[in-house]
C-alpha cells in the first residue's frame, strides 16, 4: 500500500499497538530545556527511576537566559532556579548539558540540527511546541507536555495516536527576496491559524525544494502556527549535505548506509492525503502580520484590512478585537505603520542565513531614531560564525544591539520584552496578545523585512531598498 512520509515514519517507530489502544512509539531523540523539565526529573526521582537512554537525551538552556550576560542570576529568581535545577538534574541523571558557558549553548531547535543530533527518519520530542522545526530533516518531531517529558525520560517511548495527513504544495519558483518566512506566513494566511489542526503537514513543491535547510526549518517551525501537530519536508541532497560531518551525525560507511535509507523517506506515488493545499510561489510577496494570530497577515504593500470586509462573523469579530489591541485603523497602508522595536532572533529565524539576510539590509545604514533593534543569534555556534564573517560589526555599526544566544524577545520569560503599547517587527513565530510582553504589539516578518523596518522606522518593502 502506498504510504505518505508521515505514515512511514510513524509505522517505523511503533513499539506496540494493541487493538483499540493508542500506539506506543519509540523516541530516537529527546531534547530538554530548563522550563519544562524540572517536574519531570522530580517525578523520576520520586519513583527511583533512571533516565532510560541518557545518550539519546540532550539538554540546553534557552528560554529564560539573559542575552546580555552569562550570569545565571540575571533574569530573576524563577529563571535562576530553573537553570540550577537543570544543571543538578543533568549531572545526577547523566544527561549531556550545554549550559551558559558551553560553546554549543543556544535555542534548543537551533542547537539540535547544527550538532547533528537531528537526523532524517527519527522521532524527536521536546517539551516545547516548536519542536516541529526538526521536521525539516524528514524527522517526525513534535512538542510534548511535562508529564510526557517524564514518560520519555523513563521509557524512551510515548503513546501517540495517528494524525491526519495534509500536503501543502508551493508550486513554481519564489521571486527574488522572498524567503521561507514569507512563504510560511502566506500559507498560514491561506489556511488560517487552525487550518492544520489534527494534521501532520508535508511541505512540497519546487519552491520548497529550492529552500536551504535553514529555510526549511523556518517553514516547519511554523507548522504549529496553523494548528498542525508537526511539519515535514522529505530529505534530499540538500539535507544530506547539511548533516554530513556534524558532531553526532554518522561517519564514513555508516553515513553512506544512512543516506541509502534516508532516500526511501519519500511519500510514495499514489499515496493519498486527507487534505491538500496548493499555492503559487510567484504570487507570494513580503508578508507582515497585522493582527494577533499568524493567520492575520497581508503583503507589505497592502492596507490594513477593514473588519467589515470579512464575511464570516467570527473572523470579523476577531479582526475588530485584533485591530483594537494592535492600535491600528482599517485602510491605512501598512508601510505607514511606525515601529518602536525590532527583534531578529528566535527558533524561527536566528540561524546564520537569517543573520546574513538582515546584515545585507543593515550594511551602511543606521537604525532609525527612537528604534531599539536587537539581533540575537540562535546559538554559540551561530554567533561565532557570524562574528567570523564580520556580521556583528555590520550590525553594531548600524546601531543594532548584538546579543548572546537565547530565546530572548520571542516570549516574555526573560529581560528582553516589550513595554505596553510598544510595536515590534519580529522574526519570531507568535503574535498573540502579550506574547512579547504585556500590552506589546507584535508584527511577524522575515529577517530582511525586520532589518528594513529598523533602518526606516516603519514597515518597508525590501524589494525597494537598494
From Swiss-Prot:
Main enzyme class: lyase
Catalytic activity, EC: 4.2.1.33
Binding site residues for [4Fe-4S] cluster: 347, 407, 410
GO BP: any one term: L-leucine biosynthetic process
Highest taxon of the lineage: Bacteria
Keyword NAD recorded: no
Gene3D superfamilies reported in the protein's UniProt record: Aconitase, domain 3
Keywords: 4Fe-4S, Amino-acid biosynthesis, Branched-chain amino acid biosynthesis, Iron, Iron-sulfur, Leucine biosynthesis, Lyase, Metal-binding
Reactions catalysed: (2R,3S)-3-isopropylmalate = (2S)-2-isopropylmalate
Cofactor: how bound: Binds 1 [4Fe-4S] cluster per subunit.
Pfam families in the record: Aconitase (PF00330)
Keyword presence, Amino-acid biosynthesis: yes
GO molecular function: 3-isopropylmalate dehydratase activity; 4 iron, 4 sulfur cluster binding; metal ion binding
PROSITE patterns membership: ACONITASE_1 (PS00450), ACONITASE_2 (PS01244)
Cofactor: [4Fe-4S] cluster
InterPro entries from the UniProt entry: 3-IsopropMal_deHydase_lsu, Acnase/IPM_dHydase_lsu_aba_1/3, Acoase/IPM_deHydtase_lsu_aba, Aconitase_4Fe-4S_BS, Aconitase_4Fe-4S_dom, IPM_dehydratase_rel_enz, IPMI_cat
Pathway listed: Amino-acid biosynthesis; L-leucine biosynthesis; L-leucine from 3-methyl-2-oxobutanoate: step 2/4
CDD domains: IPMI
Family indicated by similarity: Belongs to the aconitase/IPM isomerase family. LeuC type 1 subfamily.
Assembly with partners or alone: Heterodimer of LeuC and LeuD.
Function: Catalyzes the isomerization between 2-isopropylmalate and 3-isopropylmalate, via the formation of 2-isopropylmaleate.
Protein name: 3-isopropylmalate dehydratase large subunit
Organism: Shigella boydii serotype 4 (strain Sb227)
